[in-house]
């Protein structure tokens, strides 16, 4: 690979182009020649005044400071410099790029555009910090009327505000109140939901009544289900009602002689 020397005038570019053309005529293949390490620096120094003039007009157009720029699209074009020494036959155009070192040391160049050298390039609407959400929550908490009234109350009562630690504790308490507990499966008979507690109380009450019913009804099978137990209890109650009715009728038919008083 043969290095190409780039000068400040256009004659060197034309000479490099003719040399590249001769190489193409002999071999028939396009040959790309690399540039030395200092070529980019020389290129930036050469094109600093020419290639940045359209950007100056564009910046003035955006800021509203320039009134002499053309308004039609066809009357204003950005010049694209072509390096004929590098790609003569292929028809490629050279694109001027800016390295990171040039941007880091371009304070004077930025000042020429009316921008301060220590200008912050990050937008105020974009927060790249990892704790941005936490900071927004703390700012919203500090700006809330409750926090303002609390601080005023502490100052009027003579108490010393505890600062960020107290606010973080209060914020943690609010988060604990608003948070939803994890759905951990409780042990059998140890549910804490109100509906679960009510259901457990109802089942316990039914079990107690069934147990009392089993004690009242003789020869009841305790291994059967609740429906069969209730049917047996109903049959037993009917039997008791018939016995009561029979005893009442016998009592009416019975005539007892009262004992004579001595």
Curated annotation (Swiss-Prot):
Residues 8-25 have a biased composition (Gly residues). Residues 1-29 are annotated as: Disordered. It comes from the Eukaryota. Expressed in flowers. GO terms for biological process: regulation of DNA-templated transcription; regulation of gene expression; regulation of photoperiodism, flowering. GO terms for molecular function: cis-regulatory region sequence-specific DNA binding; DNA-binding transcription factor activity; protein dimerization activity. The keyword NADP does not apply. Gene3D superfamilies: Helix-loop-helix DNA-binding domain. It is found in: Nucleus. Its main location: nucleus. Coiled coil: none annotated. One of its GO terms (cellular component) is nucleus. The keyword Ubl conjugation does not apply. Keywords: DNA-binding, Nucleus, Transcription, Transcription regulation. InterPro entries: bHLH95_bHLH, bHLH_dom, HLH_DNA-bd_sf, IND-like. Signal peptide: none annotated. Residues 190-240 form the bHLH domain. Homodimer. This is Transcription factor bHLH81.
